[in-house]
Each structure stands twice: as C-alpha cells, then as structure tokens.
C-alpha cells in the first residue's frame, strides 16, 4: 500500500533538487511536489563546505538555499533524513529506508553522489575525514583545535580548497597527489603549476607523483600516512578528496541505462518513462565536449541549469540543455573562474603574467576556443564566455592582455 502520492517526487535535496522544485513553481506547476533528502538538513549550498563554512566564515543559516518558510509557502513537502532504497517504475513507487513507500507521477533523480573512500589498510581510523556533507565538515571542524599536522589526500579542487583553509588556520599541511601535477584531470599545466607554487608559498608541502600505501594508527586513531616510496608522514588528521561515486544504484537496478551516471537526453529524460535525472549523477551529451560521448559534470551551474530544463519539460514546455559549463574556486586571495570544458584540448596559451596573480589560460581544440581558466581576471571570464559559446577561432592577438577578448568576437552576419 502506498503511504502517499505526489505529482512530482524529487530525490535529492541538493542544488539540483532544490532548483527543480523552485523552477516547477516558477513555471506555473500547481501539482503536489515532494523532495526526499538523505540528510536531515534543508537544501544548502555545497561549495562553501570546503571553503567559507569550513573556515567558520559562514554559519549554516547563511548557506541555506532557501529558509524553511520558502518551502512551506510554496507547498513543497520535505521528507528529510531518509534515503530511497528501491524504485518500482511500473507502479511508479519509491521505497524509503524507513519502510514507507511514495507514489509519483514524475520522478526526478538528483541524488548526487557519495565521497569516494580510501580502500587501503587504516581507512577506517579515527581522524580520517571527507568533505561531502555538512555533517562531514562539522565533524572535521570539531577536531581541528586539537591537531597540528594535517595530511590531505587528493590534489583536486576539494583538496586544494581544504589545504588553503588548513594553512590559514596555521596547521602543518601536506598535500599528496598521485599524478604529476595538481588539477591534472581538469586543467592545463600553467594553472596547475600556479596553484602548486601558491600553496607552497603558504607553507603547504605539495608532494606530486606520490601514492598512499596505508594509514597507520594508534588506539584507533590515525598517526601517519605511509607512502609507497617515501617515509611515512606524521598526521593528526587526514582529509580525503578523491572524487565521488554517483548515487544511482536504485535506478540502475530498476532498469535505467547508465555509464558513469544515469544516461539522459537533452531534456533530462532517462531510459525509464516518467523518470528524469540531473546534476552530479547524470551523464549527458554536451555540445561543448568532444566526440558526443556522455559526460558527467559536478558543478552547481550544471545542476541548476539542468533542473530548469527538467522542470520546463515536466510542465509541458519544450526545453533542452545546451548551457556552456562554468565553475569557480576560491583559495587564499585567488578567485578562479572557469568556463567551457578542457577535454581534448590540443593547445593552451596564457594571457597575462601568472607572477602578478592575474592571468588567463585559454584552451583550444582544432583551432577554436573551448575553455578558459581565469585567475583574478573577471573581465576575461565574462568576455571569454562568449568566445567559448561561439566556438570562436583562435587568433594570435588573444595572448596579449592589452586587447580585450571581446575584440575577437566575429560580428554576426547582417
């Protein structure tokens, strides 16, 4: 027997889930809406978890996407602190971990993902932390007053942002990256080397081409990180940032097609009728990526923009997702803004001088602009976004920061 029924059930109370509900109401949807969230909290912003929230610069109320009154006023039911264990697409039912079932007219799956865990010996010792949820960050922050030596595993954005906060707190920080540079999977060498130098200048010991063998501990708590080819590193606390695992199992079991994420079309539809997916757990063909291979993007922009498309589709309006991807990161006094996708780039060049702390890395593929990484260069970001959207031809003058990027936009035919 079904405990309750909603016209739209949204699984996931992150950016994508919140924006789907908001966009449904903005598009005139008058039916019943429920958001199911595995965490006990109202939808909140995720990026601050490894930055302002971890640094205690913002309290939790300041990172809420909307206050409780917003959801109540719009008659959006919140079912928090409960996970979906199973989906029956034939009966259009979701089954919750607490034993309840819920019927749906349309199901929107935006459950995100879980932090990828270490699988080495000692992974379960006390003092080993991940930064994926508010509870993760709260647990990490609670231990900081009693520690001095922090080891961060992973040189992606989460690891770098956490390193910046730890350095600000005066901790002795070591950052371990298995590849030959930080941000190797998402950025070119000029940006990687800039961030490596910046972190080292703030006292962070950045170790590249370094792999973790195991974690050592005493009395159930981590004391050292043992490396495959070097002496163990003393550690009072370990922060792990090595990616996420998409939360898609219930839908895959129900028959949804997946490849590193639930496969969706340009309107967010999965292979199961009346089931949509978006955000971190959805894989789509993106016009700014090469070879029409489905990709999965982990960003607020992607989740929010896909949510708007799905909401419009549910409301009966033809909508497709074609937004240019963008992303940002803050570390120390650095504001990085990226636009486009670097996948398959075959050339890069730098506008400006990294030594000044303000520059832009431009990425090209087949002679056209495909992405930019802008460091403290907002004007380049704003103007460069138009170049990426237009897939503009690369021109020699683009390397000179004296020439605004808007000068290289080819005028539209009259």
Swiss-Prot record:
A Pfam family per the record: Pyr_redox_2
Organism taxonomic ancestry: Bacteria, Pseudomonadati, Pseudomonadota, Alphaproteobacteria, Sphingomonadales
Job description of the protein: Part of the multicomponent carbazole 1,9a-dioxygenase (CARDO), that converts carbazole (CAR) into 2-aminobiphenyl-2,3-diol.
Protein name: Ferredoxin--NAD(P)(+) reductase fdr
Keyword tRNA processing attributed: no
Origin species: Sphingomonas sp
A GO term, aspect molecular function: NAD binding
InterPro entries referenced in this protein's UniProt entry, alphabetically: FAD-oxidoreductase/Apoptosis, FAD/NAD-bd_sf, FAD/NAD-binding_dom, FAD/NAD-linked_Rdtase_dimer_sf, Reductase_C
Requisite cofactors: FAD
SUPFAM superfamilies per record: FAD/NAD(P)-binding domain, FAD/NAD-linked reductases, dimerisation (C-terminal) domain
Catalytically driven reaction(s): 2 reduced [2Fe-2S]-[ferredoxin] + NAD(+) + H(+) = 2 oxidized [2Fe-2S]-[ferredoxin] + NADH; 2 reduced [2Fe-2S]-[ferredoxin] + NADP(+) + H(+) = 2 oxidized [2Fe-2S]-[ferredoxin] + NADPH
Keywords, ordered alphabetically: FAD, Flavoprotein, NAD, NADP, Oxidoreductase
A GO BP entry: carbazole catabolic process
GO terms under cellular component: cytoplasm
Residues noted as binding NAD(+) in the record, renumbered to the chain: 149-177
Residues where FAD binds: 7-38
Subunit (UniProt): Monomer. Carbazole 1,9a-dioxygenase complex consists of a terminal oxygenase component CarAa, a ferredoxin reductase component fdr and a ferredoxin component CarAc.
């Amino acid at each position: 027997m079904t405990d309750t029924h909603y016209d739209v059930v949204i699984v996931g109370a992150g950016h994508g889930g919140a924006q789907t509900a908001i966009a449904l109401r903005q598009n005139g949807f008058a039916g019943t809406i429920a958001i199911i969230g595995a965490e006990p909290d109202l939808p909140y912003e995720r990026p601050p978890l490894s930055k302002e929230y971890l640094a205690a610069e913002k309290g939790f109320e300041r990172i809420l996407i909307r206050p409780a009154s917003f959801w109540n006023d719009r008659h959006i039911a919140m079912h928090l602190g409960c996970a979906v264990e199973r989906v029956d697409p034939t009966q259009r039912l979701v089954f919750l971990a607490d034993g309840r079932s819920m019927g749906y007219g349309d199901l929107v799956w935006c459950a995100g993902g879980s932090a990828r865990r270490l699988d080495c010996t000692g992974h379960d010792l006390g003092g080993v932390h991940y930064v994926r949820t508010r509870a993760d960050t709260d647990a990490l922050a609670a231990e900081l007053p009693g520690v001095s030596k922090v080891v961060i595993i992973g040189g992606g954005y989460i690891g770098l942002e956490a390193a910046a906060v730890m350095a600000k707190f005066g901790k002795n920080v070591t950052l371990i990256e298995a590849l030959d540079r930080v941000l190797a999977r998402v950025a070119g060498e000029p940006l990687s080397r800039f961030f490596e130098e910046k972190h080292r200048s703030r006292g962070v010991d950045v170790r590249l081409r370094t792999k973790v063998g195991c974690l050592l501990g005493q009395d159930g708590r981590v004391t050292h990180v043992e490396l495959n080819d070097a002496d163990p590193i003393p550690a009072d606390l370990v922060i792990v940032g090595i990616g996420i695992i998409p939360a898609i199992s219930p839908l895959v079991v129900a028959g949804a097609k997946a490849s590193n994420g639930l496969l969706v079309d340009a309107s967010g539809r999965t292979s199961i009728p009346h089931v949509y997916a978006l955000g971190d757990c959805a894989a789509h063909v993106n016009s700014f990526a090469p070879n029409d291979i489905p990709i999965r993007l982990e960003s607020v922009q992607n989740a929010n923009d896909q949510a708007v498309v799905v909401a419009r589709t549910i409301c009966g309006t033809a909508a497709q997702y074609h937004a240019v991807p963008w992303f940002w990161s803050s570390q120390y006094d650095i504001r990085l803004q990226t636009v486009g996708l670097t996948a398959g780039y075959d050339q890069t060049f730098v506008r400006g001088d990294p030594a000044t702390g303000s520059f832009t890395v431009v990425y090209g593929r087949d002679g056209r602009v495909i992405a930019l990484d802008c460091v403290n260069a907002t004007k380049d970001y704003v103007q460069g976004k138009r170049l990426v959207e237009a897939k503009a031809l690369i021109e020699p003058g683009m390397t000179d920061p004296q020439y605004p990027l808007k000068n290289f936009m080819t005028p539209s035919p009259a």
